[in-house]
């Protein structure tokens, strides 16, 4: 079984200059779409359980869903990642369940809504890194708050995210603070704030440099070249699926996501993990609406669920190809979590700060 750490996967991505889409998973259909796309394109996989997914399906169910995928596709390296942990305890529980990577989101207090101060973020992230690395498990941290540079509004996903209007400094990660944070915590990956937000309503117009700061990615990467950067809220919000949803009874207003070409530009400057959820939700919803509208007498869920798998699989394939992930699964030689622990303990994986 090819369950590997996020650190190993992203180190490989950095060495060969590609990015890895990290898809949220809630159910069988999403899991199958992701794995079938990876199988077709020879792509390594990061699947993640968000706070909402853990509440909806339960972490043990998600764990076994992911392990089943690994069993069926043993040739595909898979990282099982816990997204947006709101406390070290949450992360510790995920490690006990067998997750190979966790995110400690110390940018927010334990309620998942109140922006935290810097010292709190450092402290809880340090705690998480200490016990995670002792198990060979990777840790993603976060610095800055997700939200729109266009409106100043914070972004929320599945009950996790700051509330209300944030100031500009909170919405853009400071490169010097990022360097200090990585030096103190030794996180493997860092989620940064550059103007993206969770959900479908990211931008009211196609984003520009004023609302999506690729320049900030470049500045942060220059300071912490060996730390893998993470873009959250990076769905592209396919306009074709918005059109289908609204054509068959939906009421989603005009909205735009993060253009794929902007993500590709970010990958050139250290972005290695790209979080995607909304795109799969839109494709799934559109496929169901269209099928039921065209087949009003059908009531077998397997028939419309099969349509969702195909729709989501196409998006996954497109992202694997665009981000350069395709063709790399077979090149990764899995390292056990015990092996990763030995590398952490030796200091081999300590971050480099410029």
UniProtKB/Swiss-Prot annotation:
Q: What pathway is this protein a component of?
A: Carbohydrate degradation; glycolysis; D-glyceraldehyde 3-phosphate and glycerone phosphate from D-glucose: step 4/4
Task: State the EC number(s).
Answer: 4.1.2.13
Q: Where does D-glyceraldehyde 3-phosphate bind?
A: 50
Job of this protein: Catalyzes the aldol condensation of dihydroxyacetone phosphate (DHAP or glycerone-phosphate) with glyceraldehyde 3-phosphate (G3P) to form fructose 1,6-bisphosphate (FBP) in gluconeogenesis and the reverse reaction in glycolysis.
The cofactors named for this UniProt entry are: Zn(2+)
Tell me which InterPro entries the record gives: Aldolase_TIM, Class_II_FBP_aldolase, FBA_II, Fruct_bisP_Calv
Q: Locate the transmembrane regions by residue number.
A: none
The residues listed in the UniProt record as binding Zn(2+) 1, with positions renumbered to this chain, are 84, 198, 232
Under PANTHER family, the record lists: D-TAGATOSE-1,6-BISPHOSPHATE ALDOLASE, D-TAGATOSE-1,6-BISPHOSPHATE ALDOLASE SUBUNIT GATY-RELATED
Q: Which residues bind Zn(2+) 2?
A: 105, 142
UniProt-recorded Gene Ontology molecular function terms: fructose-bisphosphate aldolase activity; zinc ion binding
Q: Report the sequence similarity comment from the record.
A: Belongs to the class II fructose-bisphosphate aldolase family.
Q: How is the co-factor bound, per the entry?
A: Binds 2 Zn(2+) ions per subunit. One is catalytic and the other provides a structural contribution.
Q: Where does the record place the catalytic residues?
A: 83 (proton donor)
In its UniProt entry, what is this protein called? Fructose-bisphosphate aldolase
Reaction(s) catalyzed by this protein? Answer: beta-D-fructose 1,6-bisphosphate = D-glyceraldehyde 3-phosphate + dihydroxyacetone phosphate
Per its UniProt record, what Pfam families does this chain match?
A: F_bP_aldolase (PF01116)
PROSITE patterns reported in the protein's UniProt record: ALDOLASE_CLASS_II_1, ALDOLASE_CLASS_II_2
Keyword terms, alphabetized: Glycolysis, Lyase, Metal-binding, Zinc
UniProt-annotated binding residues for dihydroxyacetone phosphate? 199, 233-235, 275-278
Q: Which GO terms describe its biological process?
A: glycolytic process
């Amino acid at each position: 079984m090819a369950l590997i750490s996020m650190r190993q996967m992203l180190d490989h991505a950095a060495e060969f200059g590609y990015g890895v889409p990290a898809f949220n998973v809630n159910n069988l259909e999403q899991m199958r779409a992701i794995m079938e796309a990876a199988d077709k394109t020879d792509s390594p996989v990061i699947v993640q359980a968000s706070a909402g997914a853990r509440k909806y399906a339960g972490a043990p169910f998600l764990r076994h869903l992911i392990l089943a995928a690994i069993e069926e596709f043993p040739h595909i390296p898979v990282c099982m990642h816990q997204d947006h942990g709101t406390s070290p305890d949450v992360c510790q529980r995920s490690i006990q369940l067998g997750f190979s990577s966790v995110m400690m989101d110390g940018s927010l207090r334990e309620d998942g809504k109140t922006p935290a101060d810097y010292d709190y973020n450092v402290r809880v992230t340090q705690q998480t890194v200490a016990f995670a690395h002792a198990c060979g498990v990777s840790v993603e941290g976060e610095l800055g708050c997700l939200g729109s540079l266009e409106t100043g509004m914070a972004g929320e996903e599945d009950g996790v995210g700051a509330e209300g209007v944030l100031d500009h400094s909170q919405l853009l990660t400071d490169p010097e603070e990022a360097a200090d944070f990585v030096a103190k915590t030794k996180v493997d990956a860092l989620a940064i704030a550059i103007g993206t937000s969770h959900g479908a309503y990211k931008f009211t117009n196609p984003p520009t440099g004023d609302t999506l700061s690729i320049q900030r990615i470049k500045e942060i990467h220059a300071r912490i070249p060996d730390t893998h950067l993470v873009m959250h809220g990076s769905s592209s919000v396919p306009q074709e699926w918005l059109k289908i949803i609204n054509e068959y009874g939906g009421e989603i207003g005009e909205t735009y996501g993060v253009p794929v070409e902007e993500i590709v530009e970010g990958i050139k400057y250290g972005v290695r993990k790209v979080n995607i959820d909304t795109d799969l939700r839109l494709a799934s919803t559109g496929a169901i609406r269209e099928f039921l509208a065209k087949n009003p007498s059908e009531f077998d869920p397997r028939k419309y669920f099969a349509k969702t798998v195909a729709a989501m699989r196409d998006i996954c394939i497109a992202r694997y190809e665009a981000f350069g992930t395709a063709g790399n699964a077979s090149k990764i030689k899995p390292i056990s979590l015990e092996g990763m622990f030995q590398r952490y303990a030796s200091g081999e994986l300590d971050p480099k700060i410029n």
